Amino acid sequence: MISGLSHITLIVKDLNKTTTFLEEIFDAEEIYSSGDDTFSLSKEKFFLIAGLWICIMEGESLQERTYNHIAFQIQAEEMDEYIERIKSLGMEIKPERSRVKGEGRSVYFYDYDNHLFELHAGTLEERLKRYHK
């Protein structure tokens, strides 16, 4: 029986650069670094973001960008602050997609390795309520 999400692993070209990205944007807490050791496929680091285990492993960046993404929930009043954090690291912010009123505001942005992230100020319940109108 599935009991929850265990972790998310992202392959990144530069562990240190991605560490800064995760810490500055998501307030990630680094909890492990393999250093020069390799216990898995390559050097790796583990982080906690709002209790979620995020693993980054050294490897080649994604060659293509897609809409596959990881979305983190934030409060609506924090959106502008997060957008400034994203801009301060020179991340590419995608234009906002069209939304229906009540769906919650989002910002989408790519990291250095073409992973797409979303910060969303809304909940599943709010979205379902709006879609069922």
UniProtKB/Swiss-Prot annotation:
GO molecular function: metal ion binding
Annotated binding of Mn(2+), by residue: 7, 69, 118
Stored Pfam families: Glyoxalase
Keywords, ordered alphabetically: Antibiotic resistance, Cytoplasm, Manganese, Metal-binding
InterPro entries, alphabetized: Fosfomycin_Res_Enzymes (IPR051332), FosX (IPR037434), Glyas_Bleomycin-R_OHBP_Dase (IPR029068), Glyas_Fos-R_dOase_dom (IPR004360), VOC (IPR037523)
Primary location: cytoplasm
UniProt key word Manganese: yes
Subunit relationships: Homodimer.
Protein name per Swiss-Prot or TrEMBL: Fosfomycin resistance protein FosX
Organism of derivation: Listeria innocua serovar 6a (strain ATCC BAA-680 / CLIP 11262)
